[in-house]
Amino acid sequence: MYKERSGGGGGGSSRSEILGGAIDRKRINDALNKKLEKSSTSTTTSRVFSSKDKDPFSFTSTKTQLPDVESETDSEGSDVSGSEGDDTSWISWFCNLRGNDFFCEVDEDYIQDDFNLCGLSGQVPYYDYALDLILDVDASNSEMFTDEQHEMVESAAEMLYGLIHVRYILTTKGMAAMTEKYKNCDFGRCPRVFCCGQSCLPVGQSDIPRSSTVKIYCPKCEDISYPRSKFQGNIDGAYFGTTFPHLFLMTYGNLKPQKPTQSYVPKIFGFKVHKP
C-alpha cells in the first residue's frame, strides 16, 4: 500500500506496540491540518475535539502528486497504515485496532458503489488516495510519498471510513452487523445501577465531524454516557451519527428493553428528602 506494512519481526514499530500503546492520531492530524492551512482556504481543524471544532474538512481532492510537507516529528509507526499481512484487508485490520471495537466491517461492495459515497469527496482531503487505501488498491506513485504524506493519507482514510461507516450502519446489512455487537455487549453496558448492566448502542451528539466524541446510549433509561475505554472515547461521534440507535431500536423492536421499574430515592436518616 502507501507504506510498507509492519510485520511481527524486523525493525520499526511492531503491531503489538501499535495496538498496546496510546494511538498517536493527534500528531498525524496536526500534519494534515498544516497541509490544509497551506493548500486550502477551509477552516483549520484539529484532531482534539473542542468547542471551536465545528466545521468538517472543506477540501476538494484531486489525484495529483502531493506536495512535500515539512516533518516536525520523527517517523513512527502509524495506527492506520495497513494490515500486518497481505491476506488481511485494511478494513478488517482497522476494525480490530484497539479502541475501534465500535466499528463494524463495511462491505467492500458498498464502498465501491459511487452512489453510497455521494458528497464525501468534498469533505475528505486526499479522497482518492484514502479510498484506494481502504480498498487495498496499490497507487502507482505511492513510493514517491514522504512519511508525512503517508500519514496524511492514512488520517484521511480513517476519516473517510468513518463517514462511510455512519451511512452503512443504517442499511439492512449494516444493522445486522451491529446487532451482533449489541448482543455481545461490545458497545458497553449502562453504568446506571437500576439498568442492571443493560447493553448500550453507540451514538453521536452531532452529525458534523469533529464536533464531539462518541457516546453510548442506553435504551432502558434512554440516557447517554461516556464509553469506559479512553481509546473508544476518542472516536468521532459523527462516525455513528445521531440517528443510528433510535432507528436500530425501531427496526429491531424485540431488542428494546422495558423501562426500569426502580429509581433511586434520596434519604436522610431513613426519611425521604422533601422535593420543593
Curated annotation (Swiss-Prot):
Belongs to the casein kinase 2 subunit beta family. It is found in: Cytoplasm, Cytosol; Nucleus. Its main location: cytoplasm. One of its GO terms (molecular function) is protein kinase regulator activity. Residues 1-22, 34-86 are annotated as: Disordered. Heterotetramer of two catalytic alpha subunits and two regulatory beta subunits. Interacts with CCA1. Interacts with LHY. GO terms for cellular component: cytosol; nucleus; protein kinase CK2 complex. InterPro entries: Casein_kin_II_reg-sub_N, Casein_kinase_II_beta-like, Casein_kinase_II_reg-sub. PANTHER family: CASEIN KINASE II SUBUNIT BETA (PTHR11740), CASEIN KINASE II SUBUNIT BETA-3 (PTHR11740:SF22). The keyword Transferase does not apply. It comes from Arabidopsis thaliana (Mouse-ear cress). This is Casein kinase II subunit beta-3. Phosphorylated by alpha subunit. SUPFAM superfamilies: Casein kinase II beta subunit (SSF57798). Keywords: Cytoplasm, Nucleus, Phosphoprotein.
